[in-house]
Structures are given as structure tokens and as C-alpha cells.
Amino acid sequence: MSDTVTTARATARFVRVTPMKARRVIDTIRGKSVEDALAILKYAPQAASEPVAKVVASAAANAENNFGLDPQTLVVSEAYADEGPTMRRFRPRAQGRAFHVRKRTSHITVVVESQKGSAQ
């Protein structure tokens, strides 16, 4: 078994986007090459695509700078959005009522790995 590292990871915590909306974006890039994933995210209409793109770019930079991996061969092997803490707020309504507003946060994690043969 060789000691060469072929994976790198990046995490963005407490991102102000709901996990469900982040997962919708993440599902489109899982298994794609990093270049393809960034191109998809650049033109995706969802608001969650911007923080996900930053995490993908950070994971690719970690792979290149920390482990010396070739950025051309990187593939998004794992990507997931876990639920972070929920901020609870009140929305004033008529006649003294108050509705609850839940401002959800996400922890977005992306793992990239080097495919030695060819990028997808």
C-alpha cells in the first residue's frame, strides 16, 4: 500500500443557505471533474451555487497546494451538506401575534480525488 495522498477536502461551516437547497445544487456536481463542476455552478441559477463553488475551488486548491496533486485530474468524489444550527426569529403579525421564522444554516463539505488515468 502506497503512502501517496490522492484526496483533499474543504468545508464551509455555518453557510446561510438551507441544507435542502444546497443538496439540490451538490447533487448536480457529484462525480464530475472539478473543471466541469465549476462551469456548471457558474451558470446555475440557484443562490446556493455560489458557496458550493467556493468550497469546490477551495478543495481543488487544497489538493494542489497541500498535496501536490494535478488540478486537471481532480474529480468531486464526495459532496454533502449537513444541517447547521438554526437561528429562530419572530415575524410580527396582526393583532399582537408573532410567527416563527427559521433561518437555517448548512455545513458544506466537498472531497476531491485525483483520477490518474483521465478526467471525466
From Swiss-Prot:
Name of protein: Large ribosomal subunit protein uL22
GO molecular function: rRNA binding; structural constituent of ribosome
Family: Belongs to the universal ribosomal protein uL22 family.
Coiled-coil residue windows: none
Keyword Methyltransferase: no
One CC-aspect GO term: cytosolic large ribosomal subunit
Biological-process GO terms, alphabetical: translation
Source organism superkingdom: Bacteria
Tagged with keyword Nucleus: no
Xref: PANTHER family: CHLOROPLAST 50S RIBOSOMAL PROTEIN L22-RELATED, LARGE RIBOSOMAL SUBUNIT PROTEIN UL22M
Keywords: Ribonucleoprotein, Ribosomal protein, RNA-binding, rRNA-binding
Known role: This protein binds specifically to 23S rRNA; its binding is stimulated by other ribosomal proteins, e.g. L4, L17, and L20. It is important during the early stages of 50S assembly. It makes multiple contacts with different domains of the 23S rRNA in the assembled 50S subunit and ribosome. The globular domain of the protein is located near the polypeptide exit tunnel on the outside of the subunit, while an extended beta-hairpin is found that lines the wall of the exit tunnel in the center of the 70S ribosome.
Known partners and oligomeric status: Part of the 50S ribosomal subunit.
Pfam families named among the record's database cross-references: Ribosomal_L22
Provenance organism: Corynebacterium jeikeium (strain K411)
InterPro entries tied to this protein: Ribosomal_uL22, Ribosomal_uL22_bac/chlpt-type, Ribosomal_uL22_bac/org-type, Ribosomal_uL22_CS, Ribosomal_uL22_sf
